[in-house]
Amino acid sequence: MRLLYIDIDTLRSDHLGCAGYHRNTTPNIDDLARGGVQFQNVYASDVPCLPSRTAFITGMFGIRNGVVNHGGLAADLRPEGADRNFFSRFSARSWASTFFLSGWHTASISSFPFRHGASWWNSGFMEAMNLMRGFGGERSDEVLPGALEWLDRRGKDDNWLLHVHLWDPHTPYTTPEEYGNPFADDPLPDWHTEEIRLKNWGLSGPHSAQEPWGFRPDEWGDPPPRQPWDASSMEEVKQIFDGYDVGIRYADDAVGVLMNKLDDLGVSDETAVLVSSDHGEAFGELGVYADHQAADEATCHIPAVLHWPGLDSQVNKGLHYHLDIATTVVDLAGLRIPQHWDGMSLLKNLESQSDGGRDHLILSQGAWSCQRSVRWQDHLYMRTWHDGYHGHWEEEMLFNIAKDPHEQNNLAINEPRLANEGSTILQNWTSEQLAKSYSPVDPMEVVLDEGGPFHVRGHLPAYLDRLRETGRSHWAEILEDRHPSVLKLEE
């Protein structure tokens, strides 16, 4: 058996053709879905990049492994304590180690560990390659040569795992200009109207309609050609959507190249392929554009398409974590699932073509805001401890995802019973997880004690000035009232 894991960064589930998207963004992934398993309701337990992949590789939620942020103490694995063995639990029981210790040849082509200082990602990979000499954001045409060379060298061997990380949908949108815009004549999704743009224009927060490039339009210099300075008109909104969707199509082209290579080597029938992501991306949801700042539907709902030789094609609608997909792959390969993992195998469900899944999921964000959410039935309950300077985010929010997938109508006040149900599920889950952890301290509390999420630290005083300069003084006043201790620390 062979396994190719194509890890496409920042790929939200509903922008795939096989998920019903109106643009032809993913013809190659769609082909895999038709012949494999399309999981329709997979969510990253922890977002964004570093927390998500750390949860995936360790098999543990961020509240247990300790990684919920992009900087500070909660951006490193939690110490195992005095009973740490010569070979740490994290190393011995990582997803890649499970294959490596079973005799598989394991390899990863990714700049992610270097970008985030996440050396633990490499635990269990015999070959951990940043062949692009990158720091994240490499285009597929920079990643593919190393992947194709590896497949030429190892592809016909048995029992290998190759992880290939593609960044193209991640902001900034840098698909080569000569690639053009396949979606120039395609309209925006129906849901994003001028009414929504106008509402978002008056909101606050990094990567908002007036600052889709950070806390200021020029925070990172001039935006690339595929991204506008702001969302001041529907033309600019379309440019943002197009830049993202072109990145998806460019990554999908790379998927096609890799599939063709497997065909050329004559190993397609004996190679499993998993296509998934670390997190999604918001395009107006909760006022955020072209980033991943909440524990919400847009950010946490990710695609998962699995082609496994001998497994019947099917659509699975169960509610799953990305950890469940990782665990299922290990089970399908006939390997032992580490006892401490939080993931749940779906092997029996896939064999019987039943959905399976969980009653509810807990979703966490600690790098741009401090939030945990509960996804159950048709509902998403969100609890916010740090708003990431999005002044309109309430402490409690509730959305009907079936009727309102883009989170436009907060029902928390009108549906107190459902909000209380979500709150109770979250409180019980938190207590259960901390009881199983190496430490009784919630890493989210560590983030708050350090002054808040990494990506917003140090920005508040200058951002309050910008809000006042751009006619949004009311949000500046709200943020001043909410964050007095942060202002005292940063001024």
Annotate each predicted stretch with a short phrase.
Residues 1-491:
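Catalytic domains that recognize anionic headgroups
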